Amino acid sequence: MTLQSSGAISLANIASEFGGSAPHSLSEYYLGHSGIPSSGTISMNQFYGTSAPSYVAASGGSVSTSGVWKRHYFYSSGYFYISNAGNAAGSNSVYALIVAGGGGGTGVGGGGAGGYRYLNFGVGTGNYYVTVGGGGAGRYSNYNTTTGGSGGN
């Protein structure tokens, strides 16, 4: 919850928002974000309207973690559930790599490649349905007049 933007602010208010170990002192809150310095002079008024970093929390698909990054892979259709949308002090957006299945081939020829999109966008909490399709079916023919199938959603 964001700290108030006016009025009296106490060390207890700051500790409630940002955590820390008692006994509290301002020096434990060098944050380096939201206008709060990471070193040097720090004052109570620098905390007005600030909030602790919050990051997107989500579930769904097959999940793997690499460092601070969490990846959700969808091999079949299903829900991507966002339980925490994060905030500007942490992260409130997601990156998506969407790869489409290619078309089917004919005879001895290969099919066309699928397209892709790389996106970065803000999210809100809730369920997002992910549709996974497949590539097009190939066709065998002694003649090159039979085409392969189109890829699906």
Stretch-by-stretch model annotation:
Residues 2-153:
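Glycine-biased low-complexity/repetitive sequence motifs
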